[in-house]
Amino acid sequence: MSFLSKLFGDANARYVKSALAPMVQDINSLEPEFEKFSEGELILMTAKFRERLAKGETLDDLLPEAFAAIREASRRAIGKRHFDVQLMGGMALHQGKIAEMKTGEGKTLVATLPLYLNALTEKGAHLVTPNDYLSRIGAGWMGPIYYLLGISTGVVTNDSSGLYDPNYEDAHGHGDSRLNHFRPCTRHEAYAAYITYGTNNEFGFDYLRDNLEYQPSQLRQREHHFAIVDEVDSILIDEARTHLIISMPDTESADLYKMFAGIVPQ
């Protein structure tokens, strides 16, 4: 196996060298230009990207500039600049691949890159997490980045839903400033945001609840477009064995049973 690796090279290494590294260079070359943008010019980039999509350009066409924009927004909003390896991770996720990242490599920050890029379609982008805390902390921590680019961020948990708003201050407080800026909203509003954070269970149960509704106005979710799954091995393999089951009171079916039971003997 080692002989074959030496002869043909590692597939991942070839992918990084041929597909990702040139894109990283393109993004890095844009950094000086984006650093000079005012906040007003930076937020206008989102509208310009959407206009270019409407005229026929693809997300892949926009990727270098969109990643450069989110990198600059992150540097200004939370003081963190995406490293080259994080740019590569973002590209892999955008392409639908699994990106394994070690602890400390900043996967929360990596996700902002493909989430922003795919949110430009205005069809919604989801970040699926293992628990409610990670959903709230992720949306609250990354929310200022998206906000600087004019992108709304929603979060849905077991007992609440909200939209990130830096001007809103939760009266209860949560011991972490990243959790204090979610303005309460309906689940429909949270899903209507450009980017929505939530757990696999909440997304799944809301999908099931929507299938029990009779009126379109009662639906929570919109059509599904793009999602990134955190801890993908746990969620799609380990937890996949646990069924999501939702039920309703059976009084109506019991009444129907009695009615049909009376008809059958006739």
Regions found by a protein language model. Give the residues of each.
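Conserved P-loop NTPase motor core
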Residues: 1-266
